[in-house]
Amino acid sequence: MIIKICGVRARDHALTAVDAGADMLGLVFAPSRRQITVEDAASIAEAARFAARGRGRAITLIGVFVNETVERIRDIASSCGLDGVQLSGDEPVIYADALAPLLVIKAVRFDDSAQERAWLIHDQAHVQLLVDARVPGNYGGAGVVADWERAAELARRRSLMLAGGLTPENVADAITRVRPWGVDVSSGVESNGVKDHGKIRAFIAAARAAAR
């Protein structure tokens, strides 16, 4: 089970996630209240990698983008040493080839658009799907639960990450019902809009226990 803590903006929250056993950290470069500068992201990435190495493992750093150009995504990925990118907007499937060999995580929301259908049938080793909730005018981090029934149906055909309204309290049920490759959380480990150390630890522990 891959566990991704998304929307990390502070070094101490990143280190808590690493210490608790997170596999991925998401750094948001798209305009939002969780947006981070390239400089801060590079600093957090360096600290997280150092902490992970001290525990004999690795941490995967993912940059989150919304409708950004391929050139800008590549520039930021290079500057921060990102391992992969998450495309949370309306990016066309040609981005998959353009961003290789970076890991590409594409958010899908079952909006039944032609563009999303192209991603759903796209099959490349470096591309992973992330199922999120469909919220009009919102590109993620809204705390709304995704369609677990449709996610479970998709998970039977290909591996996926599950996002959308996950919390320490419901992640075990989500894993049992959907059987995803990974889970992604942002607002579910926050208190008053700020990452909460206790909730980060509780979420990771609950996800690990459910995946055993």
Curated annotation (Swiss-Prot):
InterPro entries in alphabetical order: Aldolase_TIM, PRAI_dom, RibuloseP-bd_barrel, TrpF_fam
Question: Which biological process terms from the Gene Ontology are attached to this UniProt entry?
Answer: L-tryptophan biosynthetic process
Stated EC number for the protein is: 5.3.1.24
Pfam families, per this entry?
PRAI (PF00697)
* Molecular function in Gene Ontology: phosphoribosylanthranilate isomerase activity
Top EC group: isomerase
UniProtKB keywords: Amino-acid biosynthesis, Aromatic amino acid biosynthesis, Isomerase, Tryptophan biosynthesis
Superkingdom, natural source: Bacteria
Pathway listed for it is: Amino-acid biosynthesis; L-tryptophan biosynthesis; L-tryptophan from chorismate: step 3/5
The reactions it catalyses are:
N-(5-phospho-beta-D-ribosyl)anthranilate = 1-(2-carboxyphenylamino)-1-deoxy-D-ribulose 5-phosphate
**Protein family:** Belongs to the TrpF family.
Q: What is the name of the protein in this document?
A: N-(5'-phosphoribosyl)anthranilate isomerase
Q: Which organism is it from?
A: Roseiflexus castenholzii (strain DSM 13941 / HLO8)
Q: What is the lineage of its organism?
A: Bacteria, Bacillati, Chloroflexota, Chloroflexia, Chloroflexales
